[in-house]
């Protein structure tokens, strides 16, 4: 990019979720938990469920991309996630799902896996300071948007 004078940015993304996500147990866990809850499928939680993640709604990710495109920066490397203000534990997420679905998700607990992180929160300060970007969608609002979309499109997920 430097040789050819191409504007380039790398965004290191974490836990992006949103409407039109077809989550699987091993990838896209936010959508997977919602799909599993609506279809009475079991959810396996490795560890105690207290692990914390920052969550980034897809619309906010697109806003970050556009912030770079509309800037005068030639290049950039940015961490992007929900940041400290958009965190949730797996147990808190299950509580949110119960409120939305009107039923408790079916959950089974298994042993921690060697690669499981107990806490992951992206440091988005460079992105915030350089591009004046900040995630706008709260975790709870984003979960509700995705839940409503999955519920409104259940035929996509039935087996």
List each language-model region with its residue ranges.
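Conserved C-terminal active-site "lid" loop/helix of NAD(P)H-dependent oxidoreductases
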Residues: 58, 77, 113-134, 141, ...
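C-terminal "lid/loop" region of Rossmann-like NAD(P)-dependent oxidoreductases
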Residues: 48, 75-79, 91-94, 102-119, ...
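Amphipathic terminal alpha-helices
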Residues: 139-159
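Glycine/proline-rich active-site loop of Rossmann-fold NAD(P)-dependent oxidoreductases
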Residues: 6, 16-32, 39-41, 45-46, ...
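Non-catalytic, hydrophobic alpha-helical segments
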Residues: 61, 65, 80, 90-93, ...
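Active-site-adjacent segment of SDR/Rossmann-fold oxidoreductases
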Residues: 1-8, 36
């Amino acid at each position: 990019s430097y040789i050819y004078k191409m504007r380039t940015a790398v965004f290191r993304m974490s836990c992006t979720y949103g409407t039109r996500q077809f989550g699987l147990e091993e990838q896209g866990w936010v959508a997977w938990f919602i799909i599993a809850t609506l279809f009475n499928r079991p959810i396996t939680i490795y560890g105690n469920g207290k692990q914390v993640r920052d969550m980034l709604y897809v619309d906010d990710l697109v806003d970050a991309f556009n912030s770079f495109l509309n800037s005068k920066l030639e290049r950039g490397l940015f961490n992007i996630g929900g940041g400290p203000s958009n965190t949730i534990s797996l147990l808190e997420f299950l509580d949110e799902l119960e409120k939305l679905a009107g039923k408790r998700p079916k959950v089974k607990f298994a042993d921690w896996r060697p690669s499981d992180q107990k806490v992951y929160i992206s440091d988005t300060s460079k992105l915030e300071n350089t591009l004046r970007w900040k995630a706008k969608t709260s975790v709870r609002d984003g979960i509700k948007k995705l839940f409503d979309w999955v519920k409104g499109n259940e035929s996509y997920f039935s087996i």
